[in-house]
Amino acid sequence: MAARFPTNHSQLAQAHSTAPDPEISEASSDKHSPAPINEKNNVIPGEKEELTEADCYDELGYSFPVWKKWTILTIIFIVQTSMNFNTSLYSNATMGISEAYGVSEQAARAGAAVFLILYAFGCELWAPWSEEFGRWPILQLSLGLVNIWQIPVALAPNFGTIIAFRALGGLSSAGGSVTLGMIADIFESDQQQYAVAYIVFSSVGGSILGPVIGGFVEANLKWQWCIWIQLIFGVATQALHAVFVPETRTTVMLNNIAKKRRKSGQNPNIYGPDEITPFRERFSIKEVFITWMRPFKMFLTEPIVLTLSLLSGFSDALIFMFIQSFMLVYKQWDFGTVEIGLSFLPILVGYFIAWFAFIPAIRRNIAERKAKPEDEHAQYESRLWLLLFTAPCLPIGLMGFAWTCGGPPIHWIGSSIFAAIVGIANYSIYMATIDYMICAYGPYSASATGGNGWSRDFLAGVLTVPATPYFTNIGGQKHLQDASTILACISFVLVIAVYVIYWKGPVLRKRSPFAQHLASARNESTGRRASLFPGPGYGSHPGSRGASRMGSRSVSYTGGKGQGGGAMGAKQQDYVRRKLEEVNKEERGEKTE
């Protein structure tokens, strides 16, 4: 039955004052009914009904046929690849930019760095608006702006113009915060891991596609073609998205369905969730600021988020440092521009190996969670199981690369093999940390994973410019080996955190203020499994919004206990919303009741 909302403030106050507590029985709550019900239509006269997911589940993204879901996902795969392709292809233009504008190659690399750094912030800035206005218009706007900013970069009259519009391009990129959200729009919580693994591959793979193609471009065309190719790819991607990807955001779909039902006369009192509450109440400036700041707050105050984000960010930053260092390494074997670009393919091979390894690992994880629905370790830390074996590939790969990258008489294939091992680690770390944090933080998973994504892009951007001086100036004659050895030692320390969290995760989560509130809500809302915990949503399914008015934000990719999805009762939804409201009030500095 659709939820009913008063149409004026006095009725709203009355409804609020008489709202039933989860502990109160149905019989006792009935006496608070503000008006008689029309039995024929089950509608309270003069009131609006809110359309919930349970009322039209078959019309939402979760009920799309499998072929349609994976068609949408494949286009989102291309979108994510395009975004990351833009971050890396520019590096092949640095020599041409240096010659054209009379700046050093080191200065020219600032165009890559500023794009990545602003990309880190852009992902966080775009995500809340995709939840408010829908995924489709926000991605179209993002893709369109990025494409527009490519033109002045290619036609730049001076170097400053390149930097300015590369910065705008990075800031305009919506990134993984929106694409991961789309997974949650069309897949239930027990079906999302395979889809996430697919999109994670597009994210890391797009970064490698840049230098592979860039080698051919740099060798045969002017530097501007590194930008024009980004534009061509971007326009084609935007067209595919515009034509073949429908709106998937649950609340927006509910609004549209409600409008159709009113227009057809099926139910003149039905309204979508965003139609019930005015925009200003849902998205005040203060609430938007709180939403934007939450990922950074969690990054600094949550040990799990900080540790796993640093590990993930460091491994990704290595890839962008590699882009700068591979030229130094493989020139020792007289590799040309094209061959240096192709030397990145082993990393891509590593990504494929890791992706395929996760398929049986996900199947194993699902079986374990089903077999032990009340075991916290099985529900949470078991998601890191494969990472116990693949995370050591990071220091192993770096150390092996360090002592096989010294040039002849050592064969170049040795360093390529170890580069592939680093690729296995990079993919595995990103996939496993995203999966774990989403499960651990539930409705705040967007903020938790936002910190992860932010650290990956920000650290990659910050380390892009000093990468070449680092590899050339560290140590003496064996400077390449010494520089990579230092990176291997740093990665060894970070990888230890995986084992600490795997074994001590329950203890760390109990010390987390966010996780404590969520655990309390899970345990007290009639003992329902966490997979039925609605997060910030109307209804029980990922992607819906229940706490949007409170400034709560979610990618809505959930992965809590249990495997099912089902409608949570109105009283349980009410209770969980109040628990989330307590967290949000604390963030705003308000007293909780």
Language model regions located:
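Flexible cytoplasmic loops linking transmembrane helices in multi-pass membrane transporters
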Residues: 42-71, 249-322, 371-393, 574-593
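Helix-breaking motifs and short loop linkers at transmembrane-helix boundaries and internal kinks
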Residues: 86, 101-102, 133-134, 155-161, ...
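Cytoplasmic helix-loop-helix junction between adjacent transmembrane helices
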Residues: 165-204
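Central mid-sequence intracellular linker of multi-pass
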Residues: 2-3, 62-67, 191-194, 219-301, ...
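Cytosolic juxtamembrane N-terminal segment immediately preceding the first transmembrane helix
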Residues: 1-86, 99, 532, 537, ...
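Extracytoplasmic
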Residues: 68-105, 126, 175-176, 322-327, ...
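Conserved MFS/SLC helix-loop-helix module at the cytosolic interface between two early adjacent transmembrane helices
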Residues: 121-160
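C-terminal transmembrane bundle
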Residues: 84, 113-116, 120-123, 154, ...
